[in-house]
Amino acid sequence: MINEILQKSEKKMAASLDVLSQELSGIRTGRSSPALVEHIKVEYAGVPTPINHLASIAAPDPRYITIQPWDRSCLSAIEKAIMKSDLGLMPNNDGNIIRLNIPPLSEERRQEMIKMVSKRLEEDKIAMRNVRRDAMDEMKKLEKSKEISQDDLKRGSDQLQKITDSFIAKADKLGADKETELKQV
């Protein structure tokens, strides 16, 4: 029973870490990367659709991203979605391809991005701690109903803490790597 609770908690924490990783990859660093725009939602046929489902995205050099839609009719919708996003990029539409010039980040914008990374990282850690709390509550209920012993509860809580610490360390590393990337000029 405890193993099931631990496995369920581990899956939830891994999912939370994946979401954090995706969100951090979408934060602009002054260097072009398709991940910067691929998850921006575009209103296409009445359905919000990620850009990477509508077009090929390439980063031919460190300062440019090109977006080539498979259906040219969605060019203006992609352009509008990019302008609405909080990336601060101005799309250049030539009728076939959208080009995005990635200007170097100002020091002020760099600091804003670092704060955004820290905030997102803290939210993720809170989510992981909530998963831990829920799992502990489940184990305490089992102990209270005499389905597991106090020793099992102690062992389970120790294992749960190790799992939580491991995932929080991974999240911290993702955040630190992104901050380092943002600080590079």
From Swiss-Prot:
Alphabetical GO biological process terms: translational termination
Task: Give the matching InterPro entries.
Answer: Ribosome_recyc_fac (IPR002661), Ribosome_recyc_fac_dom (IPR023584), RRF_sf (IPR036191)
Listed A to Z, the keywords are: Cytoplasm, Protein biosynthesis
Gene3D superfamilies assigned: 3.30.1360.40, Ribosome-recycling factor (1.10.132.20)
Give the subcellular location: Cytoplasm
A GO cellular-component term linked to this record: cytoplasm
Q: Name one GO molecular function term.
A: ribosomal large subunit binding
What is the protein's major site of localization?
Answer: cytoplasm
Family to which the UniProt record says this protein belongs? Belongs to the RRF family.
Q: What does this protein do?
A: Responsible for the release of ribosomes from messenger RNA at the termination of protein biosynthesis. May increase the efficiency of translation by recycling ribosomes from one round of translation to another.
Report what the protein is called.
Ribosome-recycling factor
Supply the source organism for this entry.
Answer: Dehalococcoides mccartyi (strain ATCC BAA-2266 / KCTC 15142 / 195) (Dehalococcoides ethenogenes (strain 195))
Source taxonomy lineage? Answer: Bacteria, Bacillati, Chloroflexota, Dehalococcoidia, Dehalococcoidales
